[in-house]
UniProtKB/Swiss-Prot annotation:
MF GO annotations: structural constituent of ribosome
Source organism of this protein record: Emiliania huxleyi
One BP annotation, GO: mitochondrial translation
Pfam families registered for this protein in UniProt: Ribosomal_S16 (PF00886)
Key word Ribosomal protein present: yes
Entry protein name: Small ribosomal subunit protein bS16c
Gene3D superfamilies, alphabetized: 3.30.1320.10
Record lineage: Eukaryota, Haptista, Haptophyta, Prymnesiophyceae, Isochrysidales
Claim: Plastid is one of the keywords in the record: yes
Entry keyword set: Chloroplast, Plastid, Ribonucleoprotein, Ribosomal protein
Amino acid sequence: MLKIRLKRFGRKAQPCYRIVVTDSRVKRDGKALEEVGFYNPLTDETHLKFNRIVERLKTGAQPTETVRNIFLKAKVFDALT
């Protein structure tokens, strides 16, 4: 099953995350199929590729709870309807 989840990078105590599409069996920081966004929790900065995210959601990719909350803030799910 495909998951849309966070992949951590950045320095110690200064996390940044890439929002990636990956197989659910792959490690958190393992190889991703596609990068569809970026999230910085320290500055609350978010960059999303809306078209690719909507396409992946329509094909059955499941977002994790944290990613779902980021998508709700950015109103990604409004584009599905």
